């Protein structure tokens, strides 16, 4: 299993709006992607920092979601509330409950 971690910083006072978009639009879209397993958004309402973690069945599934433009499309849904560009990282999931 593989994880994509995307860190964002929301404009002041906009982290709740970002969480709503993530919950109501991004997660439903993710569920339609091949190999998608799970998603969560961690937020700090004081700093406006958000960390998205998505889990993928295989590395190929994760990379395909990037190559297809899916990830860019989802980040575009957050563009109006972000203070800067997101940072993307990928990881092998070494342990999970």
Language model: regions and residue ranges:
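Glycine-rich beta-strand-turn "strand-cap" elements at beta-sheet edges
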Residues: 2, 7-11, 37-47, 74-97
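Short, charged/polar surface micro-motifs in flexible loops or helix N-caps
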Residues: 12, 47-48, 58-62
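Short, surface-exposed ligand-recognition loops at beta-strand->loop->(often short) alpha-helix junctions
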Residues: 9-19
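An amphipathic, aromatic/His-enriched active-site/gating alpha helix that lines ligand/cofactor pockets
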Residues: 24-37, 55-89
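Intrinsically disordered, low-complexity acidic/polar segments
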Residues: 15-17, 61-63, 97
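Intrinsically disordered, low-complexity segments enriched in polar/charged residues with Gly/Pro
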Residues: 14-16, 26-29, 41-42
